[in-house]
Amino acid sequence: MVHSQLVPTDIRFGRLLLTGAAGALGKELRGRLASYCDTLRLSDIADMGSHAPHEELRPARLENAMEVDQIMDGVDAVVHLGGVPTEREWEPILQSNIVGAYNLYEAARKHGVRRVVFASTSHVTGFYRQDEQIDAAMPVRPDGLYGLSKAFGEDLARLYFDRYGIESVCIRIGAPSERPVTRRHLAMWLSHDDLERLVVCALTAPSVGHTVIYGVSDNLATWWN
């Protein structure tokens, strides 16, 4: 289902690429991003179901440079949610999140893509104490291999901006859900509507360079500034 726009904008993309389209956030953004582009290209290794007339399904393994290069052809901008989404053993994280991130940015460079929205995580700063309020300018302190891989992705995005001019917004996503389900979630909650607003603003803001932000709603209590 195509949702109506929450973010009024005159910018309309010809073709957007959404990786990780079969995941929980990918499924949520699939209907929401459709109204901001003519064609929404969806990619994942898992089943993405049937496609609507405005959609293209392009399965690809992030660790396979040729497959990633193919899904990048003709794309105007990328929302990169793909990869291993939680703590795992080293090898799948290495292949999907580190090699995969490199393949994605290299393909973006080759195809002239100028904007990437990179799904990072609060786990890149997971070893700060909960009584410390932190911001995106503070040094990373990953709490595991997953957080480490996303810290690499943020630095990779910095390299590709400094060296090639590809702009990125790296969103350290908190706890996205329709509503908070625990007291702990109240400090990290990101509503689905705010997720849409954040991603669309990251895609359409006139100049973002290399930006790292925390993705969280305007909650009464939060760990992040």
Segment roles from a protein language model:
Residues 95, 129-168:
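Catalytic helix-loop patch of NAD(P)-dependent Rossmann-fold dehydrogenases
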Residues 172-179, 189-211, 218:
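Alpha-helical substrate-binding/gating segment
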